[in-house]
């Protein structure tokens, strides 16, 4: 908070809270995946599992596209969403933050299919290792950017980069 500043941290929290509403688009599909995966696996139906994986990847990629479309509408109407309480530079920062957070969220939707698949295969060590690495790398990458004055945009850029790396890691692991 000291490196970011109270005003910029407040702006980050404000933008994050608005963008987080888009996470409701997932509609709890992850639990459904685990349910149907368990059913197909109990029946030794590998074809059913393959179709399930394809269907859920398609569903979550579609949700990502919807997220990006809704996010684009939000970015274009940023002044309407936040009203007149921000300065011009805060609007500019909020716009970049919103774009990055929307991309980050859009990446998490397809990643949830891979996370569910890894959970269904009970490969918890891999997931815990990724979480540990993310928690280790996040401050080591974010802190220098904050010290260099990149602010909340640098912080969210690191988060988005790490989300992308997690997605790629999960894809290759699956």
Predicted regions and their residues:
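Interfacial/gating helices of multi-pass transporter permease domains
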Residues: 1-23, 52, 152-157
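Helix-terminus/linker motif at the lipid-water interface of multi-pass membrane proteins
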Residues: 1-9, 79-86, 146-150
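Interfacial transmembrane-helix starts/ends
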Residues: 13, 46-62, 70, 94-95
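Small-residue-rich midsections of specific transmembrane alpha-helices
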Residues: 13-41, 57-67, 105-111, 165-169
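Short membrane-interface helical motifs at transmembrane helix boundaries
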Residues: 68-88
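Alpha-helical transmembrane segments of multi-pass membrane proteins
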Residues: 73, 86-111, 128, 132-137, ...
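Membrane-interface junctions at transmembrane-helix termini in multi-pass inner-membrane proteins
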Residues: 103-133, 150-153, 174
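Hydrophobic alpha-helical transmembrane segments
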Residues: 128-174
């Amino acid at each position: 908070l000291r490196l970011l500043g109270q005003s910029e941290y407040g702006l980050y929290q404000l933008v994050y809270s608005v963008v987080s509403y888009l996470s409701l688009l997932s509609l709890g599909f992850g639990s459904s995946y685990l349910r149907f995966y368990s059913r197909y696996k109990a029946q030794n139906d590998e074809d059913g599992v393959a179709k399930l994986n394809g269907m859920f990847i398609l569903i979550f990629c579609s949700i990502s596209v919807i997220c990006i479309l809704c996010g684009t509408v939000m970015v274009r109407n940023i002044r309407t969403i936040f009203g007149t309480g921000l300065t011009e530079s805060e609007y500019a920062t909020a716009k970049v933050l919103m774009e990055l957070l929307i991309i980050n969220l859009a990446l998490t939707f397809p990643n949830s299919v891979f996370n569910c698949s890894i959970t269904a295969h009970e490969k918890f060590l891999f997931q815990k290792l990724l979480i540990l690495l993310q928690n280790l790398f996040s401050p080591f990458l974010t802190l220098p950017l904050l010290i260099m004055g990149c602010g909340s945009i640098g912080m969210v850029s690191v988060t988005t980069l790490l989300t992308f790396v997690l997605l790629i890691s999960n894809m290759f692991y699956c």
